[in-house]
């Protein structure tokens, strides 16, 4: 008889509050992290919180640091791995947005060293998930790695990021609605594994931001808390599922297609938000509710607001199905025709 083993790796601690830089050491101690620490940040996030985190850790651990300048690329991942190995690093803490966290995630996975996520924005659900989005050879791919052993979300730090990032976090969370529909479709048509538990948690996160859209729009600390909670529980849903299925469907393929077609893509969550409006229409869902929520939080709902040529939107819709052919979605095996793509984008007001 075949043994069915399903591994769920989850963060052991999630800390949400204010002025948490001083808490890093106690979290590390509680989890039992030992050895030299490596703090990873970007040039901006070093100033926002990176240096403070580094100083806080110095009181109890030997510390090294690394500035990521090129975003989430394989080159930066290799550079981080090299530093971890050369300096005998015992644990890593990533202070930054999605790119910095993704670099830490893949580096720690490849070296077997635990990492803590210290997000400086609430713009996407990678802050607590096991999946890393890495740019390599021109295109972005989602790579399975490990989730952080802890997430330390300081609402005061996150609130300093431009409001646009918070609105993007809503876009990434609301995409769970169509992602779960795609997952259910793949389960019915392809017999793919489906977890009711993971799907429910993912949908709950999306519904939570929809219900609290007006509070989120205020852009205060309570707004940050609402979005961060939704993003973290989405990350946990992915860990429970053992894949990004609960939070990534055709709307994410559309966003990846835009990444490939544009020299300067918009924020990930802004693109997935737009994709969710269109995919909700294709699924026969109440797409107007998705658009309404995005409008209420001040997120873009059309190509014009994102500064994207309508032609690019149509092209992205027609090539989206080729990005992860093994991932069955509403786009099917053959994708959308140009006519169908244009019609869907026009009906939903995206173009």
UniProtKB/Swiss-Prot annotation:
Pfam families: Fe-ADH_2 (PF13685)
Cofactor requirements of the protein: Zn(2+)
Annotated residues for binding of substrate: 125, 172, 256
Annotated metabolic or biological route of this protein: Membrane lipid metabolism; glycerophospholipid metabolism
Annotated cofactor note: Binds 1 zinc ion per subunit.
Gene Ontology terms: biological process: glycerophospholipid metabolic process; phospholipid biosynthetic process
The entry's keywords: Cytoplasm, Lipid biosynthesis, Lipid metabolism, Metal-binding, NAD, NADP, Oxidoreductase, Phospholipid biosynthesis, Phospholipid metabolism, Zinc
GO cellular component: cytoplasm
Superkingdom field: Archaea
Principal subcellular localization: cytoplasm
Catalytic activities: sn-glycerol 1-phosphate + NAD(+) = dihydroxyacetone phosphate + NADH + H(+); sn-glycerol 1-phosphate + NADP(+) = dihydroxyacetone phosphate + NADPH + H(+)
Residues the entry annotates as binding NAD(+): 98-102, 120-123, 129
Family stated for the protein in its record: Belongs to the glycerol-1-phosphate dehydrogenase family.
HAMAP family from the UniProt entry: G1P_dehydrogenase_A
Name listed for the protein in its UniProt record: Glycerol-1-phosphate dehydrogenase [NAD(P)+]
The organism of origin for this protein: Thermococcus kodakarensis (strain ATCC BAA-918 / JCM 12380 / KOD1)
This protein's encoding gene: egsA
